[in-house]
Amino acid sequence: MGIYMRDDILDIITLTTDFGTNEGYVGAMKGRILNILKKYNKDAKIIDISHEIKPFNIYHGAYVLLTAIPYFPPSVHVAVIDPTVGSERKSIVIETKSGYYLVGPDNGLFTYVAEKLGIKRIIKIDEERYKPSSTFHGRDVYAVVGAEILINNGYDGEELDEMVKIDETKKRVIHIDRFGNIITNIKKDEVTFKYYDTIMIKIRHKNGIEKIIKCKFVKSYFEEKNNFICLINSEGFLEISKFMDNASKLLNVDYLDEIEIIY
């Protein structure tokens, strides 16, 4: 089986991890990519999307990838939020219908962005080919695969019928931005109430404590300055906010707290 070729992928690799920037992990991944590309006289822009994903939080990572990747030209995107590294979980390359390549663990991390971009192929990475350590597949597998995609203008291997998707049977908090806005995994097409309706939302914290809040469903933040609001954000998810205030702190909300619309 030969290499599956493309001629329109750009020499861009993005990195998204939960590694933070106080350690050398991100630097090791970048160094590995650059070393491989140098051997083939290739160059690439390595762009950091975020390394501040909450540790082990696949939901958070999935949302952040959605907010950034679709706005790049066709390119390579390596993501590592991998709490079960070294286990039997698969590693994959997703080629999208629009020419993007997504590289990382098959644990649901690419759920949202693959859904938006459309899946053309899902390719299983043969991890043993890369002789990885048991704890750092970001450096030993995913960085290498990302570089190989640029060198070969594609990636080849065993194709899979499906990928793992995150569990969305429960509605929950998947992101809290720097303004304290609370982003849930409730999507626009699941919302049945109308603009300017007042709705009741139950928040169930991970410790089992529940609270019910009242908020107005609006189109933008400024429309209600005194009370909590709900809106559909720019990525099509229901968001709980308070104008020029930090809703997450006011409500003591954290990642993965459960959300229920009770009207």
Swiss-Prot record:
Adenosine binds at D18, D82, N181. Keywords: Hydrolase, S-adenosyl-L-methionine. It holds the Pfam family SAM_HAT_N. InterPro entries: SAM_HAT_C, SAM_HAT_N, SAM_OH_AdoTrfase, SAM_OH_AdoTrfase_C_sf, SAM_OH_AdoTrfase_N_sf. It catalyses: (R)-S-adenosyl-L-methionine + H2O = adenosine + L-methionine + H(+). GO terms for molecular function: hydrolase activity. Its EC number is 3.13.2.3. Catalyzes the hydrolysis of S-adenosyl-L-methionine (SAM) into adenosine and L-methionine. Does not have chlorinase or fluorinase activity. This is (R)-S-adenosyl-L-methionine hydrolase. The lineage of its organism: Archaea, Methanobacteriati, Methanobacteriota, Methanomada group, Methanococci.
